[in-house]
A protein has these predicted regions:
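Short, cysteine-centered beta-strand-loop-beta hairpins and adjacent loop/turn segments enriched
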Residues: 127-135
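Short, low-complexity N-terminal intrinsically disordered segments enriched in polar/charged residues
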Residues: 24-69, 88
Length: 158
């Protein structure tokens, strides 16, 4: 192997470090990851907002486009664990009946916290009970997949 000068070896090493650094810059990886996370969170938030808008219109058929085929809804009742409803058709039918039974009901999202494909919604449920305004507080934990609600797990206070 021919002997190279020290300055030649330094130049080769410097070029390799520069080239590897420009191809594999650690500064770019977090930026791309951050952009992906922001994109995912924006998609999650948009899915939750669309779902809540259709919900407050009491539009069961309007919810359907925002649900995955294998969506899961865990209701707050009956106590102690609630019931689990699986599949888009079953969840839409559940909400159709619920909207009829609770025609004056309205959910107010107090806060929506998004992390990746998950969202937590702190809400107040308003309706009339015995002619008087009534409310209940709760939390929904959503999982979003491909821009649609894959799971909505509901929890209430009291």
């Amino acid at each position: 192997m021919p002997m190279r000068s020290a300055s030649h070896r330094v130049l080769v090493v410097t070029c390799c470090v520069f080239l590897l650094g420009s191809v594999c810059s650690p500064r770019e990886v977090p930026m791309k990851t951050e952009q992906n996370a922001q994109s995912q969170e924006q998609a999650t938030r948009a899915a939750i907002d669309r779902f809540n808008e259709a919900f407050n219109r009491h539009d069961a058929d309007g919810l359907a486009p925002f649900l995955t085929e294998d969506t899961v809804f865990e209701d707050t009742s009956p106590a102690p664990d609630g019931r689990r409803i699986e599949g888009k058709a079953a969840v839409v039918e559940f909400w159709r009946g619920w909207f009829v039974r609770n025609a004056d009901a309205r959910f107010e999202a107090e806060e929506v916290i998004v992390g990746g494909n998950r969202a937590t919604v702190l809400w107040v449920y308003h309706k009339m009970r015995n002619g008087q305004p009534w409310h209940l507080r709760g939390v929904d934990v959503f999982t979003v997949r491909d821009g649609k609600v894959a799971a909505k797990l509901a929890y209430v206070k009291g």
